[in-house]
């Protein structure tokens, strides 16, 4: 017997909004939203919306932080950076020791939604600003707060500042364990330090983290090298560096509310709110594997109904997306 399981979730018409809000206002050194009306948070490199949030120390690059708040009034936000150790605990350094400038920036750019059923305010800012330039490399938490009160936290995001002291080479391959070959991937990598970089104890001084699809929720931490040959540390463990490969992500396109798009069965306006009904899906358990070229769960923010893409961030509407899957009872 098979039954249809129906689920609904609120999404941005131009893409996906991360459901990671918490009612606890205590700062967590991770990617967290602390207010329920904040949506669609993104932190990415200036010229690539899918990039990992990493900067090169003194390199002149910028990250872009964007987010929405589901209300038509503007709040006044600031951000700062918190320096962390390898385990993402705040260090004892004072802000003047790791940042140039006053140590905070105002988030000046705010656009009210235009032509949308859901009223929201879109905020954006370049990171770092003139008053928040990192002086050292390492792990940082970007902390957004309201009205100059760092206890009134809105969101936090992890980012890294790279002070390159070597090079990393990596290879992803099928698991070397026979029983895991159909489910896991093995990540072999090596780190070659610069010849003039002094490292007293490589086994203790080098901290590693391997992320699956750039997500901190699933990582392999603090692997130790199998071999150290000259300036090169080799991490080719048999078991420690393996990750389960997951399934292919399911795809749907909600970039338009006017024309047909992939995976969408119906579009509705109900009680002044947009709804999208996706095509009924089914389990792929017994189907032949098909390699779909996706973005590993990442989302493209776009709106095909706009004549110009410049307004995508504040002229795209939110909608409820209803999806269903047939599964064994």
Protein language model regions, located:
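Bacterial Sec-dependent N-terminal signal peptides
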Residues: 1-25
């Amino acid at each position: 017997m098979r039954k249809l399981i129906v689920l609904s979730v609120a999404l941005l018409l131009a893409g996906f909004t991360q459901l990671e809000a918490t009612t606890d206002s205590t700062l967590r050194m991770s990617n967290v939203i602390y207010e329920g009306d904040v949506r669609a948070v993104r932190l990415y490199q200036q010229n690539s919306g899918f990039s990992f949030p990493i900067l090169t120390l003194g390199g002149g690059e910028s990250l872009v932080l964007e987010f929405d708040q589901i209300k038509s009034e503007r709040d006044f936000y600031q951000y700062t950076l918190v320096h962390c150790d390898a385990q993402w605990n705040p260090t004892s350094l004072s802000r003047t020791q790791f940042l140039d400038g006053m140590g905070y920036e105002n988030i000046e750019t705010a656009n009210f939604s235009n032509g949308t059923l859901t009223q929201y305010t879109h905020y954006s800012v370049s990171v770092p600003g003139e008053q928040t330039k990192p002086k050292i490399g390492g792990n940082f938490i970007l902390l957004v707060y309201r009205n100059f009160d760092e206890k009134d936290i809105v969101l936090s995001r992890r980012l890294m500042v790279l002070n390159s002291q070597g090079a990393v080479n990596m290879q992803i391959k099928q698991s070397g364990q026979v029983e895991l070959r159909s489910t896991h991937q093995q990540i072999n990598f090596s780190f070659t330090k610069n010849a003039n970089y002094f490292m007293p104890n490589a086994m203790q001084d080098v901290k590693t983290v391997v992320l699956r699809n750039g997500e901190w929720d699933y990582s392999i931490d603090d692997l130790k090298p199998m071999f150290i040959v000259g300036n090169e540390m080799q991490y080719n463990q048999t078991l420690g560096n393996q990750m389960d490969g997951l399934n292919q992500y399911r795809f749907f396109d909600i970039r338009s509310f006017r024309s047909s798009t992939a995976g969408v069965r119906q579009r509705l306006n109900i009680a002044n709110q947009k709804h999208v009904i996706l095509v009924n899906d089914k389990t792929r358990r017994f189907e032949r594997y098909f390699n779909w070229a996706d973005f590993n769960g990442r989302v493209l923010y776009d709106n095909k109904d706009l004549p110009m893409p410049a307004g995508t961030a504040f002229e795209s509407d939110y909608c409820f997306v209803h999806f269903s899957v047939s599964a064994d009872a």
